[in-house]
Each structure stands twice: as C-alpha cells, then as structure tokens.
Amino acid sequence: MKNADRGVAAELDGSDLRVAIVQARFNAAITEQLASSCIAELEALGVLAKHIKHVTVPGALEVALALQALAEQKDHDALIALGCIIRGETYHFELVANESGAAVTRVSLEHGVPIANAILTVENEAQAWARADEKGRDAARVAVEMANLMEDLS
C-alpha cells in the first residue's frame, strides 16, 4: 500500500459505499491513530459516517475472524484491517505478522470482498508512529478504490 495515492484514479468516490474497519487494540495509541486517519480519509472521500462500522479486537491475530464475520454479513463494500505489530526479542513477531497477513488475504479471497490491510509490521515504535497517519489514509483510499473496482467488474 505504499504510496497508494500514486497511479490511482484521479477521483475516488466513496459516497455510495459501506465500509467496516477492524482495529486491533494491542499497541492502542498507534492503532487509534491509524483508525483516526483512516476514518477521516474515508469521510473526505465521501463515505458517510453512518456507513462506517468500526469494531475493535484484542490483537492482530483476532482481526481476521472479525473480518470474516463482517464479510459473511455481506453488508459492506470493503473492509479495512488496522493493527500494529512491533518486533520483540522472540519469534512471536514473525508468527503474528505472517499469520495475520495470510488470514486477512484468505478472508478477502474466500468472500470476494476487498480488504485494505494496514496492519503495520515494524521494527520499533518510532517506525510505527512514522507510518500511522499515512497508512491509515492509504487504507481508506485502497478500500474505496477496490470497492469501486469490484462494483465495475461485477
């Protein structure tokens, strides 16, 4: 999603879209910033606040299950995954990063719903803060673009 605003359609229109966000609470201050910038961008793109569903889960490994439940409802044009995984001293970082990313992709493919994945995987807290605003906005833009594309392709 790096530079998601480059090479996209000149105007992204989210005015007719319903979007759901699943936010992991682990590293809460960072994921709150991701959510704040994501929601602000969705609204700037025309998504009505009443059409944005925002739920939280304990951590990155729980994001996919909530996404799956939302996808099964078939009430949303796009979903967004928000989280922050910071490398520690053990193998746990790789496990959580790999499994959460694969699970998000699996839900998207199995349900045919676009999911913008903004679960940050970073080496340290400074890297997370440096990305929180931009990646939240990028996730919103990706969700709107892909929802519109899926509508065009159907």
Swiss-Prot record:
HAMAP family in UniProt: Lumazine_synth (MF_00178)
Position of the signal peptide: none
Pathway: Cofactor biosynthesis; riboflavin biosynthesis; riboflavin from 2-hydroxy-3-oxobutyl phosphate and 5-amino-6-(D-ribitylamino)uracil: step 1/2
GO cellular component terms listed in the entry, alphabetical order: cytosol; riboflavin synthase complex
PANTHER family with a match to the protein in the record: 6,7-DIMETHYL-8-RIBITYLLUMAZINE SYNTHASE (PTHR21058:SF0), 6,7-DIMETHYL-8-RIBITYLLUMAZINE SYNTHASE DMRL SYNTHASE LUMAZINE SYNTHASE (PTHR21058)
GO biological process, one term: riboflavin biosynthetic process
Species of origin: Leptothrix cholodnii (strain ATCC 51168 / LMG 8142 / SP-6)
Catalytic site positions: 92 (proton donor)
Gene3D superfamilies: Lumazine/riboflavin synthase
Listed GO MF terms: 6,7-dimethyl-8-ribityllumazine synthase activity
Lineage: Bacteria, Pseudomonadati, Pseudomonadota, Betaproteobacteria, Burkholderiales
Cited function: Catalyzes the formation of 6,7-dimethyl-8-ribityllumazine by condensation of 5-amino-6-(D-ribitylamino)uracil with 3,4-dihydroxy-2-butanone 4-phosphate. This is the penultimate step in the biosynthesis of riboflavin.
Domain of life: Bacteria
Annotated residues for binding of 5-amino-6-(D-ribitylamino)uracil: 26, 60-62, 84-86, 117
Keywords: Riboflavin biosynthesis, Transferase
Catalytic reactions on record: (2S)-2-hydroxy-3-oxobutyl phosphate + 5-amino-6-(D-ribitylamino)uracil = 6,7-dimethyl-8-(1-D-ribityl)lumazine + phosphate + 2 H2O + H(+)
The EC number(s) this enzyme carries: 2.5.1.78
NCBIfam families, sorted: lumazine-synth (TIGR00114)
Protein name per the record: 6,7-dimethyl-8-ribityllumazine synthase
Family: Belongs to the DMRL synthase family.
